[in-house]
A protein has these predicted regions:
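Phosphate- and other anionic-substrate recognition elements at nucleic-acid/protein interfaces
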Residues: 1-126
Length: 126
């Protein structure tokens, strides 16, 4: 099964078994807010179609800042709509669920997650 994992934000992290990186969806001067949505749709489409992705996994929106949660929710909606149109399965996980699965504790700090990834995946530069 080919999986595309997304950490959705204005700078969206993505990973598959073959590639990973960050998509910068930041608006340029004079662009409408909808350009973020268009950029993300284009990037997701490109990866899904070129790598024959079967499942898209995303982190659920969370945080303290309402505007960031709204932006993340809009971006996630774009991904869900694309997946529905193309009949691609998708799922969402909270940060706590991801941390608990990966480290056994749902409240690990990001630095601890990185250390665990380095420990597990020695063949990859992290």
């Amino acid at each position: 099964m080919k999986i595309l994992a997304l950490d959705i934000a204005t700078k969206t992290g993505f990973a598959t078994d073959l590639t990973s990186g960050v998509w910068d969806l930041k608006l340029k001067k004079g662009e409408s807010n909808g350009m973020k949505l268009i950029r993300l749709n284009s990037k997701v489409r490109e990866v899904v179609e070129s790598l024959n992705i079967d499942l898209v996994a995303m982190e659920r929106p969370a945080g303290l800042f309402k505007s960031a949660i709204i932006t993340e929710s809009e971006l996630i909606g774009v991904v869900k709509l694309y997946c529905e149109e193309k009949n691609i399965n998708y799922t969402e996980y909270s940060a706590t669920e991801i941390k608990k699965f990966f480290t056994g504790k749902g409240n690990e700090k990001k630095v601890d997650m990185i250390e665990e990834a380095k420990r597990r995946f020695t063949e990859i530069e992290i």
